[in-house]
């Protein structure tokens, strides 16, 4: 069986116009996959050079396959049908290492056709490293590497206004474009680079903030033999992902035509502010996950898929989304409902086994950031506590007992919460404190909740009622009235 390469698998080769910092699975099944579609269906005509930003030989360089690899996109489509689509990606030309090919890295800036820079260097990637110097070959941090590359371009083209770049980071931090721009400007200042360079950075370059959304499951280790037999070739860089994807870019409207998004309907939005889209994702996708986990797990289920195939648990989650979360969000209702419908479809994806316990990690912080804002907004708007979001808090407190049907399970959170819950549940078990006192002890931790939740009208009472119902009747019976 042949390994993928351009000699044995000839096809389109595109001129290099895109630099991509990051060789990982996510960008390959998200950015490079979209570029490949645009190359095929429009005149975008843009090849990608991947820059490996870290000092590592693993995984091997994509150049061993001449940049070729296969994506397998699978999940439920818009009609709710299970689909699996294999695509040979030709958008990547080569991969270089910034550590072993530094001159080659700088040379990328000399190409007059280079226009876009994408990146995913992990959440920690857009950060400041005080020791980074201009002459380092290379600097440690991604922003410092980018500053050096931008200065190379500025110098090579004598500050030409039409040689700036559109920089589109995909790291999972708020306003990632603004954060990256600030660090590039900081390095320019600390390295005492000319004022003209700073002017050119500001005037000729666009730093766009983004929201990215797709579950990328990566190399399908357990299925690789069957998949390669089906494909008819060996591919050491197979990359699997869910059917759903969303790319929101906060940038100039002209970006739509420059990326040829006006010629192919992709799920990419060019917007003035990503904030409402971020809030939508956190509230609906992440919020539904966080409400679902303690309820479904204590109802005897182990994966998100099992939970969505359980009529009662599914009804609980869908009612939480449509009746309690969507009404308090600030985007058009039809947009929110369409997104919510996609979310529940993603939860049902038969190709992804999403363990509830793995999503349960740091549940206390997740509840505060993902659900509490909607609970408080709902109470403010209607004068009543949203029943399911409140019940989810009681279920979360019950989850921290760490025991289901007499068997213990691992609970992962900050140590102070683990210690606090261990003590509270032991005291409750020994009848030293009542359920109401336990609830008050959790809701009054202002340094966590950023307020004293015992002051929220009716919250202690309702969480206590819900928690007592869970403890006395079991999760199935307790949640039934809300399904």
Swiss-Prot record:
Reactions this protein catalyses: D-altronate + NAD(+) = keto-D-tagaturonate + NADH + H(+)
Pathway: Carbohydrate metabolism; pentose and glucuronate interconversion
Coiled coil: none
Entries under Pfam families matching the protein: Mannitol_dh, Mannitol_dh_C
Entries under NCBIfam families matching the protein: PRK03643.1
Similarity comment: family membership: Belongs to the mannitol dehydrogenase family. UxaB subfamily.
Record protein name field: Altronate oxidoreductase
Gene behind this protein: uxaB
């Amino acid at each position: 069986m042949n390994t993928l390469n351009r000699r044995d698998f000839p096809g389109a080769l595109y001129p290099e116009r895109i630099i991509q910092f990051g060789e990982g699975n996510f960008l390959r099944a998200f950015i490079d996959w979209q570029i490949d579609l645009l190359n095929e269906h429009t005149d975008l005509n843009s090849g990608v050079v991947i820059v490996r930003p870290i000092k590592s030989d693993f995984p091997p360089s994509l150049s061993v396959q001449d940049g070729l690899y296969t994506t397998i996109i699978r999940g439920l489509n818009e009609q709710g049908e299970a689909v699996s689509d294999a695509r040979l990606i030709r958008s990547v030309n080569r991969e270089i290492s910034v550590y072993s090919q530094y001159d080659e890295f700088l040379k990328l800036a000399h190409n007059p056709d280079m226009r876009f820079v994408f990146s995913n260097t992990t959440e920690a990637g857009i950060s400041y490293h005080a020791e980074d110097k201009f002459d380092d070959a290379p600097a440690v941090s991604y922003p410092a590497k980018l500053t050096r590359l931008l200065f190379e371009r500025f110098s090579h083209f004598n500050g030409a206004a039409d040689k700036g770049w559109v920089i589109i980071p995909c790291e999972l931090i708020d306003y990632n474009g603004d954060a990256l721009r600030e660090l590039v400007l900081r390095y320019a200042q600390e390295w005492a680079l000319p004022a003209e360079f700073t002017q050119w950075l500001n005037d000729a370059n666009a730093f766009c903030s983004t929201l990215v959304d797709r579950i990328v499951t990566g190399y399908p280790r357990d299925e690789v033999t069957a998949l390669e037999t089906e494909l008819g070739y060996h591919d050491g860089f197979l990359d699997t992902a869910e059917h759903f994807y969303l790319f929101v870019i906060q940038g100039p409207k002209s970006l739509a035509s420059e990326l040829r998004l006006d010629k192919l309907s992709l799920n990419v939005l060019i917007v003035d502010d990503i904030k409402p889209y971020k809030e939508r994702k956190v509230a609906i996708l992440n919020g539904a996950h966080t409400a679902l986990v303690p309820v479904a797990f204590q109802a005897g289920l182990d994966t998100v898929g099992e939970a969505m195939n359980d009529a009662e648990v599914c009804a609980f989650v869908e009612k939480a989304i449509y009746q309690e979360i969507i009404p308090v969000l600030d985007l058009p209702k039809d947009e929110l409902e369409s997104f919510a419908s996609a979310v529940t479809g993603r939860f049902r994806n038969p190709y992804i086994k999403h363990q509830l316990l793995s999503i349960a990690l740091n549940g206390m912080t997740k509840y505060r950031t993902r659900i509490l804002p909607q609970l408080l907004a709902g109470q403010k708007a209607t004068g009543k506590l949203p029943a399911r979001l409140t019940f989810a808090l009681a279920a979360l407190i019950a989850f921290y007992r760490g025991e289901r049907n007499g068997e213990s399970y691992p609970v992962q959170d900050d140590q102070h919460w683990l210690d606090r819950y261990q003590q509270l549940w032991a005291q409750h078990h020994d009848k030293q404190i009542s359920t109401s006192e336990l609830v008050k002890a959790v809701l009054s931790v202002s340094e966590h909740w950023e307020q004293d939740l015992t002051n929220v009208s009716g919250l202690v009472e309702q969480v206590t009622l819900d928690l007592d119902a869970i403890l006395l009747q079991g999760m199935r019976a307790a949640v039934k009235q809300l399904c």
